[in-house]
């Protein structure tokens, strides 16, 4: 089943659309030490990658926490069941179908994203869309957590240096997500010149396409927030940045 687009879809409609489907049984999230050079950055960031030569570059990871672990922080069990178990799984399944027999078979996920991105294209290819969304969601799950720990000093200092204050960064990050027209993502990235920047991208486009390192990403497709926040995207973004982000995971990507 194709992932839901940016249309307003009620929780009842989503349940009907996915009726009969059950959450997949997945292998545990694994980090693999034998990687090609282009994969090193993603591996050090803690993002699952697939070694070159492995046919199936798309594998759905388990969540790094229970489905109900984020509910007290504003992201319900139902949202994670739909978002991870069905939407993300659809990107994995569709991506594997499109990858089979293509010139990109055997490449790493990161290599596929970069190779299939077409700058300036009105619509990206099906393989790119599914590969990039798979990569995006791998990062999304990893930068959230129920721990609620304080922001590490190294990250705080870097944000103050780049934005003037942590509060200004949070303001810019939420504004980028709220200002993204239609489906997309907002990001905290380290640019090629080393500077920290807030960016936004449409649909499944991600920082890999521009040679940037993603430190934090937030999904602003409607399926990511409609169950819990209905059409209130700004409230979802405020809740994400203030309650859901695992700042230690973000710091590890620096």
Model regions and ranges:
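Extreme N-terminal basic, low-complexity initiation segments
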Residues: 2-13
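Short, Lys/Arg-enriched N-terminal segments with co-localized hydrophobic residues
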Residues: 34-55
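Intrinsically disordered Ser/Thr phosphorylation hotspots
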Residues: 10, 22-23, 50
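Bacterial carbohydrate/catabolite-sensing allosteric modules
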Residues: 1, 28-30, 223
């Amino acid at each position: 089943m194709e992932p839901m687009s940016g249309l307003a879809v009620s929780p009842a409609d989503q349940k009907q659309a996915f009726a009969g489907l059950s959450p997949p049984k997945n292998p545990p999230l694994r980090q693999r030490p034998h990687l090609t050079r282009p994969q090193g950055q993603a591996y050090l960031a803690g993002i699952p990658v697939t070694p070159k030569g492995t046919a199936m570059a798309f594998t759905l990871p388990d969540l790094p926490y229970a489905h109900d672990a984020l509910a007290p922080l504003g992201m319900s069990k139902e949202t994670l069941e739909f978002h991870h178990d069905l939407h993300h799984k659809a990107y994995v399944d569709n991506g594997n179908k499109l990858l089979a027999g293509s010139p990109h078979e055997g490449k790493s996920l990161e290599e596929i994203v970069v190779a299939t991105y077409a700058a300036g294209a009105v619509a990206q290819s099906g393989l790119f869309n599914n590969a990039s969304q798979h990569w995006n969601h791998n990062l999304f799950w990893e930068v959230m957590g129920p721990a609620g720990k304080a922001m590490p000093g190294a990250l705080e200092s870097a944000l103050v240096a780049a934005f003037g204050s942590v509060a200004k960064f949070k303001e810019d990050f939420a504004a980028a997500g709220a200002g993204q027209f239609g489906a997309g993502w907002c990001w905290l990235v380290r640019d090629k010149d080393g500077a920290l920047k807030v960016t936004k991208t449409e649909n499944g486009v991600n920082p890999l396409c521009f040679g940037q390192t993603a430190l934090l990403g937030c999904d602003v497709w409607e399926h990511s927030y409609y169950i819990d926040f209905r059409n209130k995207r700004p409230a979802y973004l405020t809740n994400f940045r203030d309650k859901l982000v695992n700042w230690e995971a973000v710091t590890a990507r620096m």
